[in-house]
A protein has these predicted regions:
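Short metal-binding segments enriched for Cys and/or His
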Residues: 40-50
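ATP-binding pocket architecture of kinase catalytic cores
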Residues: 95-191
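Short linker/helix segments within small regulatory modules
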Residues: 24-34
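Conserved NTP-binding catalytic cores of kinases and kinase-like/nucleotidyltransferase enzymes
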Residues: 49-138, 262-267, 368-369
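Active-site activation/catalytic loop segments of kinase-like enzymes and analogous catalytic loops
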Residues: 280-311, 326-343
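A cross-family kinase active-site recognition segment
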Residues: 165-223, 246
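ATP/Mg2+ or Mg2+-diphosphate-binding catalytic cores
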Residues: 201, 205, 213-214, 331-369
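Active-site acidic catalytic loop and adjacent metal/ATP-binding pocket
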Residues: 84-97, 101-102, 134, 233-285
Length: 369
């Protein structure tokens, strides 16, 4: 049964930690539900406080769907999954004979960047890859609309589920093949609009600025960070990066943005979501961010499945260990700066240290045999 936008008492939102019914919610910087204020505070999780009315936004949703020409619809927040909680800016929408999802963009994400991501998605959809197709505004034909002080987009929903951590381990080869297919088709993509520059390609200046902004952490000693910074400065940005092929990349090719069909052992990718971070970069960025692994056997296997669709060049293979180091810094920065999750920072810092230790083993794993 699909519930209406305004939840009935029996479907009231509850805190995942303490179970209490919520009249005020806390969401993380990506809009994902954390829980009540007390539980978020106890766990040191930073977030935005919203009322239930702001969370459901029934009047705004109704106004937006009218602009997209929908009638007889019902809307609800997506149900929790093993991969993620409901989000403040997503709704599932059912209308006669069709299913959609509705997205409200944050005000800091500009219209030119919405056009950019929608241009990338349209390019891939025209190449018959499984990405959401946006629905045009019924009056203007634009790929998004403005209402209630924000920009909104409506997409035709794709079937599938997100993977659990265990399913992701089994599915990584298939995910690598799909990423390679995306990269093949994006090599000639010239998007309209502008990429969102804060989420653009990292440079050495970005690395320096990020490292200077971090608070001291016991698992991130200066000598570790200094070694990584120097390695990136000389080996990656100095020697390899200028010669690496550049193309439009997805930007956030992680488990939460990939849909699957079938059981764990035979699952296939049925959808790739969330192109907000699409930008011009190296293919290694997507690979290192979403599929990179510090364990040489797993890295070798993932590279092999990717390369069956889009063979990695010799210089891409040579640069893989440094790309993994850069991706590790990005992951730490996200947890340090946006989520303030120091437990996850500790875990990722330990992974970084092991990656530094095993750099040459990773280089051998990436090399063409």
């Amino acid at each position: 049964m699909v519930m209406p936008v305004s939840p009935e008492p029996e479907t009231s939102l509850c805190c995942a930690f303490c179970g209490r019914v919520l009249d005020v919610v806390v969401v993380n910087p990506t809009g994902e539900l954390i829980g009540c204020e007390e539980c978020a505070g106890e766990r040191g999780l930073a977030g935005e406080v919203m009322t239930i009315e702001e969370w459901n936004a029934p009047a705004a949703v109704a106004e937006v769907l009218e602009q997209f020409g929908l009638s007889g619809w019902q809307a609800q927040k997506p149900a929790p999954s093993p991969a993620q909680q409901p989000r403040a800016h997503y709704w599932e929408v059912q209308s006669p004979g069709a299913r959609y999802f509705l997205k409200r963009f944050y005000n800091w994400y500009p219209p030119a960047s919405i056009r950019y991501m929608h241009s990338v998605m349209a390019h891939l959809a025209n190449r018959r890859l499984p990405v959401p197709q946006w629905v045009p505004n019924s009056a203007t034909g634009e790929s998004f609309t403005e209402a209630a002080g924000a920009n909104w987009a409506l997409y035709r929903a794709l079937d599938g589920r997100t993977a659990t951590r265990q399913d992701w381990m089994w599915g990584r080869p298939k995910a690598a093949e799909m990423l390679a297919s995306l990269h093949l088709e994006l090599q000639d993509c010239l998007p309209e609009g502008e990429e969102f520059h804060p989420w653009g390609a990292w440079t050495l200046d970005t690395v320096d600025r990020v490292l200077e902004s971090w608070q001291p952490h016991p698992d991130l000693p200066p000598e570790l960070l200094g070694h990584v910074r120097d390695r990136l400065a000389t080996r990656y940005f100095g020697e390899l990066y200028p010669a690496l092929p550049k193309l439009v990349v997805h930007g956030d090719y992680v488990a939460a943005n990939i849909l699957w069909k079938g059981d764990s052992m035979s699952a296939t990718v049925s959808g790739v979501l969330d192109f907000e971070r699409a930008h011009l970069d190296t293919a290694l960025f997507d690979f290192a961010w979403g599929l990179g692994d510090r364990r040489p056997p797993l890295l070798r296997a993932t590279i092999a499945t990717y390369s069956r669709v889009r063979p990695l060049s010799a210089i891409e293979r040579e640069a893989m260990p440094e790309a993994l180091l850069l991706g590790a810094l990005m992951g730490i920065d996200m947890q340090m700066t946006y989520f303030s999750d120091m437990d996850e920072v500790s875990r990722l810092a330990q992974e970084l240290a092991l990656m530094v230790r095993d750099t040459e083993s990773l280089r051998k794993a990436a090399a063409l045999k």
